[in-house]
Amino acid sequence: MELESLFQDIMDGFAVYNNKVAVAVSGGIDSIVLLHLITSWAEKRQCPPPIALAVNHGLRPESQEEVEFVVSYAKELGVKKSFILNWKRQNIKGNVQSQARKARYELLTEWCKNNDVKHLFIAHHKDDQAETFLLRLERGSGLDGLSSMDYKSSLNGVCMLRPLLSFSRSRIKKYADFYRLKWVEDRSNQSLKYKRTLYRNLLKASGNQEILTERICLTTLHIKRATKALMHYTRLAFNDCVNVHDLGYIEIKLSEFYKLPEEIALRLLLYSIMVISSKHYKPRYNSLIAIFNKVLQKDNDVHCTLSGCKIRKYGESILIIRESSKIQEISVSLPLNAPIEWDNRFSCTILGNQECSVTIAPLKKTQKIPKFLKDYDCCPEVFYSLPVVLKDGKVLAYLHLNHDRKNINGDEVQCIINSTIKQNLVILAGI
């Protein structure tokens, strides 16, 4: 079939040969077709077969039966390994679909990271792209949102691949019928209480669904080109305007910031907040633009919080500082064999031979700033978001920056920190 031939070319372009890959499989027609196509491609290219991952949200009575179908049918299709990931939901309020979607991707990417799988395949297709565009247009999304989904993106450190984006729902159905594939029908896909169903029906009712879908997808490509150009200039602006400090915060030089076009300046502020907060999702636009407008009013004092960050005007700069109360403490047993990630801003190496359980917490918990930190010429609020090693609630070790490390004897404990913010910026925005 033509679809199969085109799919093989797309897969070859992804260059995932001999790497372990996983496929998110709901049991619906799209993901079953994707699994069949990838299994066939892997066999022809003599690559390892894909791993099938099925998420059980437990929201419908038939959920368990559907994920069990995925496991059994994947085996029929030649898949050697399949896993069911269960969502342990608690106190669901508000938009259930949105929370289920977020949980699904967290479960999938977490499994991939824990099992050294770097590529996760998703069965989004051309009709999904058009529906997503209309949904985001209604919500008032900016250019990034309207550019919709890409063939390749990154989430939680996992590469997400969408090889079906070029194919319509009708072509996928023809493929499934040709190979007599089995799938389950999710009745909630027909429910009019969901906006996506309304837009799906709107496209059908247009009388020229295929042409309209094609035009919408073409529009998303135009927007994507524009956003890539904006990101190019945002990266250049980071080089001129931003200092990423070893103490885990970002400084934006206002003299350079004020010279930027507003869209570039807004993006620079946005990505600075996202990388310090360690959140993959953008803050609400209304909250972000309110802070941005305050920053643009040159005589204004800026003293705001957003997404677990403090945004402060300090001298001739804007500082993006982690909010200490939002930092999660972690408990570890000493001695450690390897560095440990803390708050997604620091890699902490704890040296010493003591055998004990300790907590790595924000310095704010001690209510005390050690004298050596006061030698740093920066806003004192920065110090409270730094790590400190506690044993039984008492300070066992303060931090040392990697370039300040010193030799210690076996009885001492030392916490050496390296900022990971620059690496995270590269992952987040290619900066």
From Swiss-Prot:
<feature type="binding site">
    <location>
        <begin position="26"/>
        <end position="31"/>
    </location>
    <ligand>
        <name>ATP</name>
    </ligand>
</feature>
<dbReference type="InterPro" id="IPR011063">
    <property type="entry name" value="TilS/TtcA_N"/>
</dbReference>
<dbReference type="InterPro" id="IPR012795">
    <property type="entry name" value="tRNA_Ile_lys_synt_N"/>
</dbReference>
<comment type="function">
    <text>Ligates lysine onto the cytidine present at position 34 of the AUA codon-specific tRNA(Ile) that contains the anticodon CAU, in an ATP-dependent manner. Cytidine is converted to lysidine, thus changing the amino acid specificity of the tRNA from methionine to isoleucine.</text>
</comment>
<dbReference type="GO" id="GO:0005524">
    <property type="term" value="F:ATP binding"/>
</dbReference>
<dbReference type="InterPro" id="IPR012094">
    <property type="entry name" value="tRNA_Ile_lys_synt"/>
</dbReference>
<protein>
    <recommendedName>
        <fullName>tRNA(Ile)-lysidine synthase</fullName>
        <ecNumber>6.3.4.19</ecNumber>
    </recommendedName>
</protein>
<keyword id="KW-0819">tRNA processing</keyword>
<dbReference type="GO" id="GO:0005737">
    <property type="term" value="C:cytoplasm"/>
</dbReference>
<dbReference type="Pfam" id="PF01171">
    <property type="entry name" value="ATP_bind_3"/>
</dbReference>
<comment type="similarity">
    <text>Belongs to the tRNA(Ile)-lysidine synthase family.</text>
</comment>
<keyword id="KW-0067">ATP-binding</keyword>
<keyword id="KW-0963">Cytoplasm</keyword>
<dbReference type="GO" id="GO:0032267">
    <property type="term" value="F:tRNA(Ile)-lysidine synthase activity"/>
</dbReference>
<keyword id="KW-0436">Ligase</keyword>
<dbReference type="GO" id="GO:0006400">
    <property type="term" value="P:tRNA modification"/>
</dbReference>
<keyword id="KW-0547">Nucleotide-binding</keyword>
<dbReference type="InterPro" id="IPR014729">
    <property type="entry name" value="Rossmann-like_a/b/a_fold"/>
</dbReference>
